[in-house]
Amino acid sequence: CCSYTNLNIKKYRTLAGRDFGESELNEARDMFLFSFYARGMSFVDMCYLRKTKVWNEALHYERQKTHQVFSVALTPQLREIIFRYDDPGSPWVLPCMQRGMLSSANKQEDMNGDVPPASLYNFYCMALHYYLILLKEISRRLGCRNLTFNVARHTWATEARSMGVPTPHISEGLGHTSERTTRIYLASLDRQTVDEVNERVTKL
């Protein structure tokens, strides 16, 4: 079933094809899958992903944790989720920030205006709490340990490893650059290589 760090292929396919009959649960499922399809993108980066960062057939974003800039090619799965949750009145690619705003004390914030960083961070925290509760219910229905966005991230890495993808490619896909030797090696990898890795992994 699920381990604490990754979701096995059987359960992943069950999750991806499951209609939970409730829009909130289906949305949480899609946010989990988006993270997986986007090379294990961190939930905080999903929250802060603006529509202006989608161009040239790719998502371009700066990791909140490291401030490094990454690009992820738009796969059919990513396009489908983005289209499903597109809100013409929102500056965000995904509904995460809106969910956080609706869960916070300040529900009147103009998301198209100059929102204070502290408010955005609060919305992110509330959104994370919101989705984790829903993922816990999804986990119960699937009969496995609790799903989190870290599980999506580790699942991507685990599947890439099982396909024989070199560790440096996996590190680049996840945005890991903490080890000096890995950083030196990754400098020679281009985006196309990493996108090809992601295409292989997400065709499960």
State where each predicted segment sits:
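Basic, Lys/Arg- and aromatic-enriched nucleic-acid-binding interface segment
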Residues: C1-F43, C47
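Catalytic-site neighborhood detector that most strongly recognizes the C-terminal catalytic loop/helix
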Residues: N6, R63-H67, L174-E199
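Conserved tyrosine-mediated DNA breakage-rejoining catalytic core shared by Y-recombinases
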Residues: Y48-F83
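Active-site/catalytic core of tyrosine-dependent DNA strand-transfer enzymes
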Residues: N6-R13, T75-R145
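Short, basic (Lys/Arg/His-rich) helix/loop patches that form interaction surfaces
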Residues: G17-E24, F123-Y124, L132-E172
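Short, polar N-cap/turn motifs at the start of nucleic acid-interacting alpha helices
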Residues: T52-A58, R145-N146, V165-I184
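DNA/chromatin major-groove-contacting recognition/catalytic segments
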Residues: T14, S71-P76, E80, R84-Y85, ...
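Short alpha-helical segment immediately N-terminal to, or the first helix within
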Residues: F34-S35, L49, E159-A160, G173
